[in-house]
A protein has these predicted regions:
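Multi-pass membrane catalytic core of lipid/isoprenoid biosynthesis enzymes
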Residues: 68-73, 91-141, 217-258, 262, ...
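Cytosolic, membrane-interface loops and tails of multi-pass inner-membrane proteins
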Residues: 15-33, 83, 87-110, 205-230, ...
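Small-residue-rich segments of transmembrane alpha-helices in multi-pass membrane proteins
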Residues: 49-54, 165-178, 226, 291-304
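Membrane-embedded alpha-helical segments that form the functional core of polytopic membrane enzymes
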Residues: 50-53, 57-91, 99, 123-127, ...
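N-terminal amphipathic/basic-hydrophobic helices that include classical n-h-c signal peptides
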Residues: 1-13
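Extended hydrophobic alpha-helices typical of membrane-associated regions
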Residues: 29, 249-313
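Intramembrane alpha-helical segments
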Residues: 32-38, 73, 103-191, 272-279, ...
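Membrane interfacial helix-start motif at the N-side
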Residues: 33-42, 46, 109, 155, ...
Length: 313
């Protein structure tokens, strides 16, 4: 039997159960799909563009391919580890929540032990990538590991969990900046990180409104559970106003050009549109607000920052 087949059967046994019949029912693509769904690979569109934006803004010219490669590799490792840990730590909560009970770990399709191994391997990948970037990246890695691990516990004791998540993703922008500059001097990297942090926290509050009934009944901490949906949406708006203010400060501090300001205007319009989709008494468009609009926000920022670097008027 080929080595690949043996390896695949071993991984499949560790994941889902114990019988050859179960193995035959799972193709390699199905297993890969299960894992990519668990770590929500499609949500990479939220933070990776901002990590690359930090990389571009901190570079005097366009960054080299090696720097771009190891920055992306570090991001993939960090994000995969964080999402996997979140799924393992929250498995009990997810199992009790009708919206999340069919996720891979609570449904028994992926075993927690294998998921933890994957998380450790992902952190190792992040550390390897960081070792190929400026030394400050490696020196800051323990803070990243701690914060990414810490987030998953916060919904058990504080409604500020959304802010903690925002800071985690804001760290991606700082990581990109350090990968290019080797330091965090001046206001600009912190304004970029603040923009990302408040943006993520704001849309996470909107997303959490879906679980208001469950969170209040099960004593899961969140801004909607603490303040109610209507006030939570107001808090989300305030956070997104801070996002716009931070991006304004970033553009002014770096004297960015016309493309950046086109992106800035687009982001302000899209965030306004996002909040028009969601009402306290109508959450039917939360998914559209969460994924579609916010995906465009991060991509618009990245593309316009890249164009601003390449084309000068």
């Amino acid at each position: 039997m080929p080595v690949y087949d043996l390896f695949f059967k071993y991984i499949t046994l560790m994941q889902i159960g114990n019988t050859p019949a179960q193995i035959k029912s799972r193709s390699p693509l199905a297993v890969i799909g299960e894992w990519t769904e668990m770590i929500k690979l499609e949500h990479t569109v939220f933070a990776l563009p901002f990590a690359l934006s930090g990389l571009i803004l901190a570079s005097p010219q366009l960054p080299g391919l090696s720097t771009v490669f190891f920055t992306i590799l570090a991001f993939i490792g960090a994000r995969s580890a964080a999402m996997t840990l979140n799924r393992v730590i929250d498995a009990g909560i997810d199992r009790a929540n009708p919206r999340t009970k069919d996720r891979a770990i609570p449904a028994g399709r992926i075993k927690p032990g294998l998921a933890l191994f994957f998380a450790v391997a992902s952190f190792a990948l992040m550390l390897y990538a960081a070792s190929n970037l400026p030394i400050l990246c490696l020196q800051l890695s323990p803070i990243a590991v701690f914060w990414l691990s810490f987030y998953s516990f916060t919904k058990r004791f504080t409604w500020l969990c959304h802010i903690v998540l925002g800071i985690a993703l804001g760290g991606a922008a700082l990581g990109g900046w350090v990968a290019a500059a080797g330091c965090l001097s001046g206001a600009a990297p912190w304004l970029l990180a603040l923009a990302v942090s408040t943006w993520v926290a704001g849309f996470d509050v909107i997303y959490a409104c879906q679980d208001y009934a469950f969170d209040t009944s099960e004593r899961v901490f969140s801004i909607p559970a603490r303040f109610g949906i209507a006030r939570a949406l107001l808090i989300s708006r305030a956070l997104h106003l801070a996002t716009v203010a931070s991006l304004l400060g970033l553009g002014l501090s770096l004297h960015l050009g016309i493309f950046y300001w086109l992106g800035f205007t687009s982001v302000a319009v899209m965030l306004t549109y996002e909040h028009s989709l969601v009402k306290a008494d109508d959450l039917s468009k939360v998914n559209a607000a969460f994924f579609n609009v916010n995906g465009f926000v991060s991509i618009a920022c990245f593309i316009t920052i890249l164009l601003d670097k390449i084309i000068k008027f």
